[in-house]
């Protein structure tokens, strides 16, 4: 959160925050900054006040949450088991692409998933959601429907990308860029 707020302080004028995955919680909280004109969630979490990603994950379990693919370091950081990265994070990519992403992943502090949202920006600002229809990390399926549920609750402009995995921004970069451009145009009117 602090890193995003530092960057916002450096901006000259309005901006749009874009986030993927757990970054959605970050822009949900940081997006209340007056310089933020809109929010774009790309296969991302979108918690409400009093919620956090860990609890939302229990309410809407994904294939990932039912697996042992997430590993934890002794000092409290989490990462994808590289052997399972392709299956759960990047199923629509080639094995070579997924292996590269697995080797270059950034570890995340496990406590980040427990950060409780106080004031969700999507309640007062326009938002867009890119739903990755074959996401196994954040469940978009009809039985759990988390990405779609988030978007409906926030009244987000929603674009669903058929066949896309959690790493929707790789193979479907044009669709993701189009949503970001659409958001920028909408808030600049």
Language-model region placement:
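Flexible "cap/lid" loop of the alpha/beta hydrolase fold
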Residues: 32-82, 86, 109-113, 138, ...
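Catalytic His-Asp charge-relay segment
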Residues: 124-131, 158
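Conserved strand-to-loop "acid loop" that flanks and positions the catalytic carboxylate
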Residues: 39, 128-135
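Gly/Ala-rich beta-loop-alpha elbow adjacent to hydrolase catalytic centers
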Residues: 18-23, 27
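Glycine-rich phosphate-binding loop signature in dinucleotide/nucleotide-binding domains
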Residues: 10-13, 183-188
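Conserved acidic catalytic loop of the alpha/beta-hydrolase fold
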Residues: 1-15
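Conserved loop-alpha-helix segment in the C-terminal half of the alpha/beta-hydrolase fold
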Residues: 133-170, 182-183
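Active-site nucleophile elbow and catalytic-triad environment of alpha/beta-hydrolase enzymes
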Residues: 103-121
């Amino acid at each position: 959160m602090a890193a995003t707020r530092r960057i916002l302080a450096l901006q000259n004028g309005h901006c749009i925050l874009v986030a993927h995955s757990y970054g959605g919680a970050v822009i949900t909280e940081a997006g209340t900054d007056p310089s933020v004109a809109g929010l774009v969630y790309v296969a991302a979490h979108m918690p409400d006040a009093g919620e956090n990603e860990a609890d939302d994950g229990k309410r809407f379990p994904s294939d990932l949450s039912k697996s042992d693919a997430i590993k934890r370091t002794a000092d409290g950081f989490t990462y994808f088991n590289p052997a399972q990265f392709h299956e759960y994070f990047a199923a629509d990519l080639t094995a070579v692409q997924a292996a590269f992403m697995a080797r270059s992943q950034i570890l995340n502090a496990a406590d980040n998933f427990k950060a409780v949202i106080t004031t969700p920006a999507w309640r007062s600002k326009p938002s867009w959601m890119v739903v990755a229809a074959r996401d196994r990390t954040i469940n978009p399926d009809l039985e759990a429907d988390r990405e779609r549920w988030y978007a409906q609750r926030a009244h987000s402009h929603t674009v669903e990308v058929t066949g896309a995995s959690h790493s929707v921004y790789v193979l479907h970069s044009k669709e993701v860029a189009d949503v970001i451009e659409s958001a920028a145009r909408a808030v600049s009117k």
